[in-house]
């Protein structure tokens, strides 16, 4: 079973609520372990700042990014570790707001990309995550079907996330694509651990960071005994959906348009 490290509340000055700890950014240097997963809302600048603070304080051997393909990450190998250089070097990359991660990239000694090609995502949608992942699918738990309750919950969440604009029966494929991404991020982290040593940090969305069905599940399946901690980041005192070892909620929420307006006949 994965061991989960919790920073001492006394040293962190933290308030413990429902066994979840809320920490200030100054406590990142107290963290020790093998793997640190830091979630985010992709458009929240304060979340990126927390991640930057974590990378600067922990000084991981490698940082895995959901937002980069392996090919894009390879292009950053010789780039000066300054935000300005990273903004320039990532211009034209596939992630639309990749420049927002320049500060995190600048503090990352080794940068690893884990984003999947669209063809792999389509394959998971049609043929399942296990077939697409390949020979290690059993090791990472992809050949084990989800419990019915979790499957239903996840399909409903995908339906809502897509603004009810896609047929409900397509959501099973969306869940498979999500499982493929989670397992792929986990594999990238284990490869980084084997190559560079601990600790390794993953920068990713909250949905992938959650401990009940995200990347930690696949790490546990593939390599029990890792010391892992997952941070979720909420906004304006509201926690993100799912379970995490630690939740940060003090970031303000940026102004956003309703993403479902594009699907509305009145929008």
Question: Language model features by range: what are they?
Answer:
Residues 46, 50, 70-75:
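Membrane-embedded segments
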Residues 74-192:
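A substrate-binding/cap region within the structured catalytic cores of diverse enzymes
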Residues 44, 70-71, 209-212:
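Active-site environment of divalent metal-dependent phosphoester hydrolases
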Residues 26-59:
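Zymogen propeptides
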Residues 5, 15-34:
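N- or domain-start disorder-to-order transition segments that initiate the globular core
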Residues 184, 190-193, 201, 208-267:
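C-terminal regions of proteins
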Residues 62-68, 229-233:
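Short internal beta-strands
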């Amino acid at each position: 079973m994965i061991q989960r490290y919790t920073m001492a509340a006394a040293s962190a000055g933290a308030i413990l609520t429902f066994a979840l700890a809320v920490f200030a950014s100054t406590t990142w240097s107290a963290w020790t372990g093998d793997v640190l997963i830091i979630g985010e809302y992709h458009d929240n600048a304060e979340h990126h700042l927390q991640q930057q603070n974590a990378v600067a304080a922990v000084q991981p051997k490698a940082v895995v990014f959901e937002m980069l393909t392996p090919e894009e990450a390879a292009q950053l190998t010789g780039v000066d570790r300054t935000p300005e250089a990273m903004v320039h070097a990532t211009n034209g990359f596939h992630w639309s707001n990749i420049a927002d991660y320049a500060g995190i990239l600048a503090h990352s000694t080794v940068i690893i990309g884990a984003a999947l090609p669209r063809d792999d995502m389509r394959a998971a949608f049609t043929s399942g995550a296990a077939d697409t992942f390949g020979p290690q699918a059993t090791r990472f738990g992809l050949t084990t079907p989800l419990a019915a309750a979790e499957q239903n919950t996840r399909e409903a969440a995908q339906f809502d996330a897509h603004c009810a604009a896609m047929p409900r029966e397509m959501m099973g494929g969306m869940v498979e694509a999500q499982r493929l991404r989670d397992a792929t991020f986990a594999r990238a982290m284990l490869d980084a651990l084997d190559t560079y040593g601990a600790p390794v940090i993953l920068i990713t969305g909250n949905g992938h960071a959650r401990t009940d069905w995200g990347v930690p599940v696949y790490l546990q399946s593939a390599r029990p005994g890792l010391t892992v901690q997952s941070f979720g980041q909420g906004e304006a005192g509201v926690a993100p959906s799912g379970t995490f070892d630690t939740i940060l909620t003090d970031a303000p929420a940026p102004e956003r348009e309703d993403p479902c307006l594009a699907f509305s006949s009145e929008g």
